[in-house]
């Protein structure tokens, strides 16, 4: 096989780019990365993780660019987030792919760098979104979407122990009486519906592959359903391979396989990530990451952002009129929804619930809240505002 198309360095997902090729540290690409706060370093072909250690960044949030199949193979085994093979004039592209490269390019200019985002610490408090102004909600009719884990619920060591924070369900109930409300989760649909337990709202599970409307009608992505047997097989193999590592939990969901490593030793995380990425390559499944989790799901162009657009369009066709989408989320998978909220026909309000798991990473959100407890308070204040007729 030859080269791939353009690949993207995304500061929301990547803290550093490590080069195993020539004078790349002096390239225009390296300069552009420095301008947006993404670190760079050179690697040794046999130990790319050492460069990540020097920069104090995790391999799971780093990119490796290398022209040596041995370096590509070492980066893949260490669990790096993105491994790019560099094959000038198409030389050894097949060898780089066989070694585990996610993409093969002929020149560094094929790499695109995402710009324009702000760091989490730079965002204003979401209380400002309750006022007027171009980005505010005063005088507008919102449709409010929530992630669950890390947004309505605190992140806990045992995913099965997650529950909405105090006041969250009462605030959701009040809000749902005044505007459309949806919970979009990576959990199974039945799981998140039971945990939240608020009637009369939208629930989407598995990042939107399956959802129920307030009237109880069920919708699913039939293309994703075709991958259910493959996901089951992958879950079984990963349980056998990783289940003996202390602190690792392999969660088989209807439309995904989530491997949690929050409680695992840090020196085993690369091994876990490498195993999941290898399973994704073997079974042609998409690999996504989150807060101390790496997941397999159907390799389809569908995410929380597209789910949000689908729900908004459904509401529009049902006569809801012009709605301003609001999305509250904390994780990398929520960035798709932030992009959708900002890029839709109506400028919406993307709100990040801050955390420390990924450092001060970049985000497409425009506002922030400091915890799920603050998210519950924001929801209550928005319900108050709508009850007073100020929405």
Curated annotation (Swiss-Prot):
It comes from the Bacteria. Mg(2+) binds at residues 147, 149, 330. One of its GO terms (biological process) is trehalose biosynthetic process. Coiled coil: none annotated. Substrate binds at residues 147-149. Keywords: Hydrolase, Magnesium, Metal-binding. Its cofactor is Mg(2+). GO terms for molecular function: metal ion binding; trehalose-phosphatase activity. Transmembrane segments: none annotated. The active site is at residue 147. The keyword Nucleotide-binding does not apply. InterPro entries: HAD-like_sf, HAD-SF_hydro_IIB, HAD_sf, OTSB-like, Trehalose_PPase. Its EC number is 3.1.3.12. It catalyses: alpha,alpha-trehalose 6-phosphate + H2O = alpha,alpha-trehalose + phosphate. Pathway: Glycan biosynthesis; trehalose biosynthesis. The keyword Metal-binding applies. Removes the phosphate from trehalose 6-phosphate to produce free trehalose. Belongs to the trehalose phosphatase family. This is Trehalose-phosphate phosphatase. It comes from Mycobacterium avium (strain 104).
